């Protein structure tokens, strides 16, 4: 298949992955990667313009590498190209996948950053102004981040009826529209019970976390509120939703030693994604948890 063919089926491919449940961000990333590929192939002289070969894709990857792109970025772009080619082959539109044996750049293993257990407990146990609905909301939001390890996109998408306080669990729609049930620790249940009576009614009638005007908090707003909270009350360290999730995963894995259970709780489709947390080494942890999560303990214990 040549450049014209690759361009002709691009929209159909993107429509297909939308139907498969890929998020808007994922679809947009695929679109950028594939449009960039088409532009690279168009720039390059080819011995056979009607048939893009393995060498053409290798050359495109080298050009991106020459622009200073990192190994992880290059590997992601190659993955986008490969998934498109596989889709074309499965539908009989391409004879063979020209990217099949192209090796992605070797990626350095990177251990996720996590926060010390004692620091998180101290921060989350700070007094909350019960007369300030936004402070109560934020406290519930942060307890949920660490207590259940949700992605910022998952917290953003939560509806009020996704939370079952009596049963202490939350219904989560994760990547690829995959659904899972995640337990709520005692501190999260307590914080949500304090927040729900003060919650600004959602303009869509559904959103769990809303702003003053009732609109659903955006992912960016959630990130900003967390960063501001940490800056105002902490020791100046940067805190992100990813770090809260990594802390949840690492602390829980160290306490439970059950990597399969942690995989399910995090919503990882592959165990290899979860295994990176086995390499976390927290200097600030003096002992393992008495329970699977420290926030599960009630105040009177």
Curated annotation (Swiss-Prot):
Compartments in which it is found: Cytoplasm
Limits of the Tyr recombinase domain: 110-290
Superkingdom to which the source organism belongs: Bacteria
GO cellular component: cytoplasm; Holliday junction resolvase complex
Domain annotation Core-binding (CB): ranges: 1-89
Family of this protein: Belongs to the 'phage' integrase family. XerC subfamily.
Complex formation: Forms a cyclic heterotetrameric complex composed of two molecules of XerC and two molecules of XerD.
Function, as annotated: Site-specific tyrosine recombinase, which acts by catalyzing the cutting and rejoining of the recombining DNA molecules. The XerC-XerD complex is essential to convert dimers of the bacterial chromosome into monomers to permit their segregation at cell division. It also contributes to the segregational stability of plasmids.
Protein name (database record): Tyrosine recombinase XerC
Record gene name: xerC
